[in-house]
Amino acid sequence: MTRPTRPFVSVIMPCRNEERHLDRCLESILASDYPADRMELLVVDGMSSDRTRDIVAEYARHHPVIRLLDNPRHIAPCGLNIGIQASRGEVIVRMDAHVIYLPTYLPILVQALLERGADNVGGVLETLPGADTPVARAIAIGLSHRLGVGNSYFRVGAPEPRWVDTVAFGCFRREAFERAGLFDEELVRNQDDEFNFRLIRRGGRVLLMPTARAYYVARTSLRQLWRMYFQYGYFKPLVARKVGRVMTLRQLVPSLFLTTLAACGLAAVWWRPAALAGMGIAAAYAAAVLAASAAASPRHGPRVAGALTLVFPVLHVAYGLGFLLGLRDHVLRSRPRTAELSALPMSR
């Protein structure tokens, strides 16, 4: 693309209490190879209680492309919709405050959007540890390992561009929102998955571009990781209810694993083979976790490998329990916990 033909791009960044990561994120966006006079950056703040707003305001004083908007409802989908409605761009790009973007990230996405017939294009996230501790480093490994996240291509990567069901964040044609509507504000998490499903159902296409790369800064503790993946699992049944089906089979695996173990434990009271089946399943899972963790030891050291034996179960059990409770609340009882989750950070 030559400079005059580059579309005007609106970058939308919903955030809340992101003072730790915001400087690096904003600096990376401002260093983009995409021309500054062909973009705007709308930071939509969910009424942060830390220094997030001050940081954005200071950057806005020196960089007129940045605007600070308010999101009084706190949660990410509301912030996204506020940003979209206030934006001017022909192309709308969602970005996240927990991420550091390479200078080529935005140009690659925009070019692919225009040349490949896609309605939404995303890149690949390389996961960085949020701290220099064995647990934080293990979390980063787990979030980019197939045992941890399955075939989630935007996390584990792909050798070439491919059409997918969802991507992280996304670079959209404005017409995509005219076609499919805005983000669903009932979904504290997984709102991008639901939107992409809606877009595809209306004839849109979602493309993963492996050459568009960014660095996602992961959570630093097992408690933070548990909370995040519990939320992901919790809102998946609500997404399934809205779209009329489970979007991918990998979403069912953690909850099926937990319910199978529980069923074997209960059945073992009356039928001894059930206990053996449950122990066999648990042993196979433990062997997979230990093998994956041991494989990380030569490169990352035994302390990180030891922490990884905890990271994989946290990912799977938190997601599985969240899914089961979400099934109860969103499908069986219709008692969502959106309000009590609204104060949590927005990042992936």
Q: Positions of the model-derived regions?
A:
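N-proximal low-complexity "stem/linker" segments adjacent to membrane-targeting elements
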Residues: 1-31
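Cell-envelope/extracellular polymer assembly enzymes that use nucleotide-activated donors
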Residues: 7-10, 40, 194
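A conserved acidic beta->alpha catalytic loop
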Residues: 45-54, 73, 96-99
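Acidic donor-binding/catalytic loop of UDP-sugar-dependent glycosyltransferases
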Residues: 51, 97-112, 197
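Glycine-rich, basic loop-to-helix element that forms the pyrophosphate-binding segment
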Residues: 71-87, 107-108, 163, 167
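Short aromatic/hydrophobic "clamp" motif used to bind/position activated sugar donors
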Residues: 92
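Conserved donor NDP-sugar-binding/catalytic core segment of glycosyltransferases
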Residues: 103-137, 141, 213, 217
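Catalytic donor/gating beta->alpha subdomain of glycosyltransferases that bind UDP-sugars
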Residues: 129, 178, 184-247
